[in-house]
């Protein structure tokens, strides 16, 4: 499974360049920030963008909700066989996005070491558990 974790700035740069891979983007931003700064088109390869906002915390009241975790899993399940790549991004590309990416990898490949063994990432464990739980409840 080809999955990349990016910061918001890296995702913006990616969207402005041509790519041949059909890509699903999971876009995580802070509450209150701009949502529609990425666009998909035939040139950049982005076929679907799942947009959501939640804080980078383990507080159930402000972090990822069960409904958001379910939306991620449903979109990944629906588009995985039609996509060449999944990009997960958050503001810094280190915590929330890493938690989501690790959960996707764990569910589909049973191997999340690509994320957990990389010192660049500090996955948000609450996000990881919520998304993994949503996958198991599908």
Describe the predicted segments one by one:
Residues 30-33, 55-57, 93-95:
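Short, solvent-exposed loop/turn segments at secondary-structure junctions
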Residues 41-52, 112, 126:
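Adenosine ribonucleotide-centric catalytic and binding domains
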Residues 50-87:
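Helix-loop module immediately N-terminal to the HCX5R catalytic loop
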Residues 69, 73, 98-101, 128:
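Short amphipathic alpha-helical surface patches that serve as generic macromolecular interface elements
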């Amino acid at each position: 499974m080809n999955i990349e974790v990016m910061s918001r700035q890296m995702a913006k740069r990616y969207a402005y360049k041509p790519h041949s891979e059909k890509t699903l983007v999971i876009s995580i931003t802070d509450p209150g920030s701009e949502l529609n700064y990425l666009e998909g088109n035939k040139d950049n390869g982005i076929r679907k963008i799942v947009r959501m906002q939640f804080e980078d915390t383990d507080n159930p009241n402000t972090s990822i909700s069960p409904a958001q975790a379910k939306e991620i899993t449903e979109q990944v399940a629906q588009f995985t066989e039609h996509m060449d790549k999944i990009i997960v991004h958050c503001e810094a590309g280190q915590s929330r996005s890493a938690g989501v990416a690790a959960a996707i990898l764990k569910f589909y490949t049973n191997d999340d070491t690509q994320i957990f063994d990389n010192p660049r990432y500090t996955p948000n464990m609450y996000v990881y558990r919520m998304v993994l739980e949503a996958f198991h409840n599908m």
